[in-house]
């Protein structure tokens, strides 16, 4: 799918092939910047797809620019003095928005420790189970380090996720509706 259009393409595939398991794997820009409308409207329609969203708080594949998820004060190539929320607005908390909708499942995990990775794997499994059971839209946000664009060694980046990013974006299951949707 074109950048930002993954949820729309996934919804179309699922409607054409409802017997298939359909997922998107998206980053900050794809899911919450250029693809924000597609991500949210797939959720609003409760499309029976699974979205895996990797949040590393920057546009990691294009040079580390500020993303919708960039934390207050975080320096990026386009916010060299740190994100100023008075100018750019606050970071987008996608799950907080999704919790207001009639979706099947929403969770946020991290890849910082073996225990957190195991929980995140369980969240992803739960998201796919929701789709396989015909319950509707499922969304898993995965907090991930970005050592290259954060300008730090991998272990320090992992610690930053655990100490700073998880404080702003807490992990856990936030929506867990276990009933088949009504079409």
Task: Show where each model-derived region lies.
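Short, structured patches in soluble enzyme cores that scaffold and shape functional sites
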Residues: 53, 109-110, 141-144
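Short, well-ordered, mixed-charge alpha-helical segments that flank or form enzyme active sites
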Residues: 31-34, 58-63, 114-118, 146-150
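Flexible, low-complexity linker and terminal segments
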Residues: 132-183
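"Short basic amphipathic alpha-helical interaction patches in structured regions
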Residues: 37-42, 65-67, 149
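Conserved thiamine diphosphate
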Residues: 19, 67-133
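Thiamine diphosphate
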Residues: 1-60, 122-126
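Structural motif
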Residues: 20-23, 48-52, 96, 104-106, ...
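Short, hinge-like loop/turn segments at secondary-structure boundaries
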Residues: 42, 67-71, 156-159
């Amino acid at each position: 799918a074109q950048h930002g259009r993954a949820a729309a393409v996934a919804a179309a595939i699922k409607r054409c092939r409802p017997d298939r398991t359909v997922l998107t794997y998206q980053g900050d820009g794809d899911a919450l910047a250029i693809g924000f409308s597609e991500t949210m409207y797939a959720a609003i329609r409760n499309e029976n797809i699974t979205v895996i969203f990797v949040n590393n708080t920057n546009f990691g594949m294009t040079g580390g620019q500020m993303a919708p998820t960039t934390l207050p004060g975080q320096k990026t190539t386009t916010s060299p003095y740190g994100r100023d929320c008075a100018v750019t607005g606050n970071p987008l908390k996608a799950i907080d928005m999704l919790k207001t909708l009639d979706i099947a499942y929403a969770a946020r995990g991290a890849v910082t420790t073996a225990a957190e990775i195991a929980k995140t794997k369980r969240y992803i499994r739960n998201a796919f189970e929701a789709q396989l059971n015909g319950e509707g839209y499922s969304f898993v946000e995965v907090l991930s380090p970005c050592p290259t664009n954060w300008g730090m060694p991998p272990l320090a980046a992992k610690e930053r996720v655990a100490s700073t990013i998880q404080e702003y974006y807490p992990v856990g299951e936030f929506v867990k509706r276990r009933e088949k949707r009504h079409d």
